[in-house]
């Protein structure tokens, strides 16, 4: 065998050459002139043994700023949360880890039940009637929700708050361009959606209004007030929500939301360079047949035993491609499983306690910044993120913090020139008092 991982012997090679009627491998390249063929050896490193290779790769990995050694205050949609140890154990089981879309559900009962549990827990958190098996991430879930609204209402205008994550808005723009839809962004005031601006844009051509709760700045939107404005014009009300926050906040479904979407990353899914994540999509029974992605339902077999099936499949592209409710194919089943296991391990009380710790630690950090002389820009209620006016370029501050073992907050000036020198600080349950104090003191020293 020429290579330990490539099962080809000299006899195999000889047989293959004889089969195609050539004597040597060089004859395969006879059409290529000698003058342009490469001669000599490639200037690459020699092969290493497995221990040598592991040592070299470990050295390269140590150059990364990992969250085991650095205290992270970076959020903006991707958060450093606690994941119960059991999550990785369940995910690593081969029947889950290698499973693909269960097109033959009768032999995939374990996979289907895991997805069904995910759907159930998402419904409980959001206060909605039905949830799908998952979406790619929060951004694509938001865009798919807007497409559903446009198709249902047969209207072409989508209103989205500028307090919605800028990357989600960018995904929405991409989707809307292909569907020839108009996207109008509503400005924010004091860190939340400007209701006067929203009211002025509302008319009978609006398909939906999209807000985030908590929003991109961590602020809590007034969903009850927004819902009245939206439904007066018979538009759909879409809310993007951090599912962890719903452990303590009133769910959007209680405020009359038609569709609730978001990213399940806070539950058991690591940051890992920003992805992959797991979007969720929940809605009311009225839109059950228009929801994108796969739906798992519970039923009974001919013997009266409980079973799980893929239901309402006529909506999907593998049944009727031209009339499918969306063209999402593989869902994020493995990450949805991670979220399910994390939520199950935490339980209702655990999710609530985790959310409360995010609030209390973020409030402590806010007070420390104010005592140090920093201005916390928005004064409304918030979940686990808030905006600090740094008076200096955020990139410079973050570069200095990184040398101290701290990953600083998000530079809001990247997306909004009005917020240059403003940092979005995220504080999760994993941050300690000592880490928060160190962050504030180091930033105070940089001022």
Swiss-Prot record:
Query: So what EC number does this one have?
Result: 1.4.4.2
Know the name of this protein? Probable glycine dehydrogenase (decarboxylating) subunit 1
Catalyzed reactions per annotation: N(6)-[(R)-lipoyl]-L-lysyl-[glycine-cleavage complex H protein] + glycine + H(+) = N(6)-[(R)-S(8)-aminomethyldihydrolipoyl]-L-lysyl-[glycine-cleavage complex H protein] + CO2
What the record says about family reads:
Belongs to the GcvP family. N-terminal subunit subfamily.
Q: What is the lineage of its organism?
A: Bacteria, Bacillati, Bacillota, Bacilli, Bacillales
Keywords attached to this entry: Oxidoreductase
Highest taxon of source: Bacteria
GO function term, MF aspect, one: glycine dehydrogenase (decarboxylating) activity
Q: Which organism is it from?
A: Bacillus cytotoxicus (strain DSM 22905 / CIP 110041 / 391-98 / NVH 391-98)
| One Pfam entry name | GDC-P
The record, for CDD domains, names: GDC-P
**Described purpose of this protein according to its UniProt entry:** The glycine cleavage system catalyzes the degradation of glycine. The P protein binds the alpha-amino group of glycine through its pyridoxal phosphate cofactor; CO(2) is released and the remaining methylamine moiety is then transferred to the lipoamide cofactor of the H protein.
The UniProt entry, under InterPro entries, shows:
GcvPA, GDC-P_N, GDC_P, PyrdxlP-dep_Trfase, PyrdxlP-dep_Trfase_major, PyrdxlP-dep_Trfase_small
* Subunit comment: The glycine cleavage system is composed of four proteins: P, T, L and H. In this organism, the P 'protein' is a heterodimer of two subunits.
The broad enzyme category this protein falls into is oxidoreductase
Which GO terms are recorded in the biological process aspect for this UniProt protein?
glycine decarboxylation via glycine cleavage system; nucleoside metabolic process
């Amino acid at each position: 065998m020429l290579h330990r991982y490539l099962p080809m012997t000299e006899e195999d090679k000889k047989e293959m050459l004889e089969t195609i009627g050539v004597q040597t491998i060089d004859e395969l390249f006879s059409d290529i002139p000698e003058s342009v063929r490469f001669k000599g050896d490639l200037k690459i490193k020699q092969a290493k043994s497995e221990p040598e290779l592991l040592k070299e790769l470990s050295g390269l990995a140590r150059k990364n700023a990992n969250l085991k050694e650095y205290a992270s205050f970076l959020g903006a949609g991707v958060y450093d949360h606690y994941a119960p140890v059991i999550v990785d154990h369940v995910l690593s089981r081969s029947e889950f880890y290698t499973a693909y879309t269960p097109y033959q559900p009768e032999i995939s009962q374990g996979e289907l039940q895991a997805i069904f549990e995910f759907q159930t827990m998402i419904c409980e958190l959001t206060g909605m009637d039905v949830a799908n098996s998952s979406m790619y991430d929060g951004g694509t879930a938001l865009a798919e929700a807007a497409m559903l609204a446009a198709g249902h209402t047969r209207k072409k205008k989508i209103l989205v708050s500028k307090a919605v994550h800028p990357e989600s808005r960018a995904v929405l723009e991409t989707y809307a361009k292909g569907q020839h839809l108009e996207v109008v962004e509503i400005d924010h005031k004091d860190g939340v959606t400007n209701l006067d601006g929203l009211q002025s844009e509302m008319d009978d051509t609006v398909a939906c209004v999209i807000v985030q709760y908590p929003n991109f700045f961590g602020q809590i939107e007034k969903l009850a007030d927004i819902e009245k404005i939206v439904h007066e014009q018979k538009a759909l009300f879409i809310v993007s929500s951090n599912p962890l926050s719903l452990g303590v906040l009133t769910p959007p479904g209680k405020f009359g939301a038609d569709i609730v979407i978001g990213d399940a990353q806070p539950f058991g899914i690591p940051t890992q360079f920003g992805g992959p994540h797991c979007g969720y999509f929940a809605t009311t029974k009225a839109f059950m047949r228009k929801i994108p992605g796969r739906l798992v339902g519970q039923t009974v077999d001919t013997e009266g035993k409980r079973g799980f099936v893929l239901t309402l499949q006529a909506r999907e592209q593998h049944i009727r491609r031209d009339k499918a409710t969306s063209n999402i194919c593989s869902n994020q089943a493995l990450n949805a499983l991670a979220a399910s296991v994390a939520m199950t391990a935490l339980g209702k009380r655990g999710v609530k306690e985790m959310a409360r710790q995010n609030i209390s630690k973020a409030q402590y950090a806010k007070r420390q910044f104010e005592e140090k002389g920093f201005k916390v820009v928005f004064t409304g209620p918030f979940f686990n993120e808030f905006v600090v006016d740094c008076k200096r370029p955020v990139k410079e501050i973050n570069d200095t913090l990184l040398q101290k073992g701290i990953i600083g907050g998000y530079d809001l000036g990247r997306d909004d020139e009005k917020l240059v020198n403003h940092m979005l600080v995220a504080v999760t349950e994993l941050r300690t008092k000592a880490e928060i104090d160190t962050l504030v003191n180091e930033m105070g020293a940089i001022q």
